Swiss-Prot record:
GO terms for molecular function: mRNA binding; structural constituent of ribosome. InterPro entries: Ribosomal_uL13, Ribosomal_uL13_bac-type, Ribosomal_uL13_sf. It comes from the Bacteria. Keywords: Ribonucleoprotein, Ribosomal protein. This is Large ribosomal subunit protein uL13. It comes from Leuconostoc citreum (strain KM20). Belongs to the universal ribosomal protein uL13 family. The keyword Lipid metabolism does not apply. One of its GO terms (cellular component) is cytosolic large ribosomal subunit. This protein is one of the early assembly proteins of the 50S ribosomal subunit, although it is not seen to bind rRNA by itself. It is important during the early stages of 50S assembly. Part of the 50S ribosomal subunit. One of its GO terms (biological process) is translation. Pfam families: Ribosomal_L13 (PF00572).
């Protein structure tokens, strides 16, 4: 009788991937990255262990929003003070803080618990083409071949 393989935290090797977000649809990029952050692309996936790899996203300012999402999709947050509801459109985020737009999209696809927050720390987003992780020798992923 075979037993199910359960990975232990000490046995996991984390890789580094780099993804160019230029002209890639936001939702398709987010689903692939969330899957890699969770470790679901590995045959040894264990749901209760942080198995995911590190993902570097460059050119976040040039991500594509389809339809009228740039003007109609609204992100809300509250300051916990009376009248403190703030709203920003996706186009506004893409213009002024493109890293935050990708982080909001990807973090929304991760589990809402301590493990999901830990997996979210493996995401590194940069608006331009430069990043500070050259020492990790990231492997380039072509997102169009994965979707």
């Amino acid at each position: 009788m075979r037993t199910t393989f359960l990975a232990k935290p000490g046995e996991i090797e984390k890789k580094w991937y780099i993804i160019d977000a230029k002209d890639v649809v936001l939702g398709r990029l987010s689903t692939v990255v969330a899957s890699i952050l969770r470790g679901k692309n590995k045959p040894t996936f264990t749901p209760n262990v942080d198995m995911g790899d590190h993902v570097i996203i460059i050119n976040a300012a040039e991500v594509k929003l389809t339809g009228k999402k740039a003007t109609d999709k609204v992100y809300y947050h509250h300051s916990n003070h009376p009248g403190g509801l703030k709203a920003r459109t996706a186009g506004n985020y893409r213009e002024f803080n493109p890293e935050k737009l990708l982080e909001l999209s990807i973090h929304g696809m991760l589990p809402k618990n301590t493990l999901g927050r830990k997996q979210g720390l493996n995401l590194h987003v940069y608006a331009g083409a430069e990043h500070a992780h050259a020492a990790q020798q990231p492997e380039a992923l072509d997102i169009n071949k994965l979707v």
